[in-house]
């Protein structure tokens, strides 16, 4: 598990040491830094995946397109340098990257520190580390296992991609690969703690069962398209209706589907990042997805969720109070805001065994109370 994220001169952050838990909640104002936290992790994962033997940070790739050095280096302190790092157990790795100029589309690896000691970068570099170090580095392995589902998810589509099964490992940043992944892995076993009683313990049946929990009567089919590298997702909203194209059912079904596939398909040791799981879900379903994410985090999968929903937060709090999933010490909650000078600021409320938070910063999921007070 990744225990912390370390950033310097990256986007809005001059310096950030961010604790990560089995379940980490990122909240706060728009433009406060939540997305930058996620992008830093995805940026490292993208580089490790696409440039295994490279000495540069890949700013523009299949997962992220961030532009040039001037777009990612903090404009106040960064000049031509930034740092990205992570901790796991008793090990901390920080990578420093330099740009030849602020228009550069990639940043060169200039230094690597492990527990504060600089490593020799004169030899071959593998996964952003000297070759002898790379294979046994747990931090690198966790970063390589990141799965990211962004807030900009694919809407209803007639056809969805079906990749080679060896490369169809994730749902895709927009969820566009979820149906294909479920097709290839339909018979995979799901963790016993996640099973819905009375349903077969396979991924396909458990995704169907979870969909019915959120949308009673819902069912799904995945149909391979003959002669094409594609599948068709069919949905119905009740047992009495016919299976239909996704365009003809509630939008929330197609938005929740990739979330469920992503979290139920994850393996222990994976890092799952979900942005705005509440999109197009009614309040009860938003609370339920919070409880499910807490349950997923108790099964060895590290979950990082970015949300604007008090219902998602309350679902997590209820899961902690009900002792059905993660322990209070395994949950990290962060609230990002801006000070008068525009610098990013973070407050981190702590949750107790009853699901209560020790502090409630102004602007932290309090809009309902503020509106109610004004109405009264």
How does the language model describe each region?
Residues 1-49, 53-59:
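Pre-Walker A-like glycine/lysine-rich segment at the N-terminus of P-loop NTPase domains
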Residues 10-12, 25, 32, 153-156, ...:
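Short, solvent-exposed loop/turn segments at secondary-structure junctions
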Residues 15-21, 264-268, 295-297:
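Phosphate-binding P-loop
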Residues 47-256, 262, 267, 347-376:
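Phosphate-coordinating catalytic segments in nucleotide- and nucleic-acid-processing enzymes
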Residues 76, 288-376:
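C-terminal lobe/lid and adjacent interdomain/linker elements of RecA-like ASCE P-loop ATPase modules
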Residues 274-277:
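Walker B catalytic motif
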């Amino acid at each position: 598990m990744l225990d912390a994220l370390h950033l310097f001169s990256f986007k809005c952050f001059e310096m950030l040491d961010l604790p990560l838990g089995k379940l980490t909640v990122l909240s706060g104002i728009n433009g406060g830094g939540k997305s930058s936290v996620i992008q830093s992790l995805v940026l490292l994962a993208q580089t490790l995946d696409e440039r295994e033997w490279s000495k540069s940070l890949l700013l523009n790739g299949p997962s992220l397109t961030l532009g040039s050095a001037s777009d990612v280096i903090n404009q106040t302190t960064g000049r031509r340098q930034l740092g990205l790092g992570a901790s796991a157990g008793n090990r901390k790795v920080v990578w420093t990257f330099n740009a030849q100029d602020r228009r550069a589309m990639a940043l060169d690896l200039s230094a690597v520190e492990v527990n504060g000691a600089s490593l020799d970068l004169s030899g071959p570099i593998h996964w952003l580390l000297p070759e002898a170090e790379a294979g046994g580095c747990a931090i690198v392995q966790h970063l390589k296992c990141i799965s990211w589902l962004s807030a900009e998810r694919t809407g209803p589509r007639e056809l969805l991609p079906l990749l080679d099964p060896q490369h169809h490992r994730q749902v895709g940043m927009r969820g566009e690969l979820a149906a294909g992944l479920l097709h290839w892995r339909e018979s995979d076993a799901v963790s016993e703690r996640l099973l819905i009683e009375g349903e077969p313990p396979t991924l396909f049946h458990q995704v169907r069962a979870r969909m019915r929990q959120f949308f009673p009567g819902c069912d799904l089919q995945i149909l391979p398209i003959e002669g094409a590298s594609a599948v068709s997702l069919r949905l119905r909203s009740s047992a009495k209706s016919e299976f239909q194209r996704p365009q003809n059912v509630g939008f929330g079904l197609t938005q929740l589907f990739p979330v469920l596939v992503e979290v139920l398909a994850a393996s222990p040791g994976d890092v799952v990042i979900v942005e705005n799981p509440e999109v197009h879900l009614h309040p009860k379903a938003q609370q339920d997805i919070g409880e499910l994410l807490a349950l997923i985090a108790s099964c060895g999968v590290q979950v990082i969720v970015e949300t604007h929903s008090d219902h998602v937060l309350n679902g997590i709090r209820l899961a902690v109070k009900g002792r059905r999933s993660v322990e209070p010490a395994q949950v990290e909650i962060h609230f990002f805001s801006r000070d008068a000078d525009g610098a990013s600021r973070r407050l981190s409320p702590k949750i107790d065994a009853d699901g209560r938070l020790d502090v409630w910063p102004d602007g932290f999921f309090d809009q309902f109370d503020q509106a109610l007070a004004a109405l009264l």
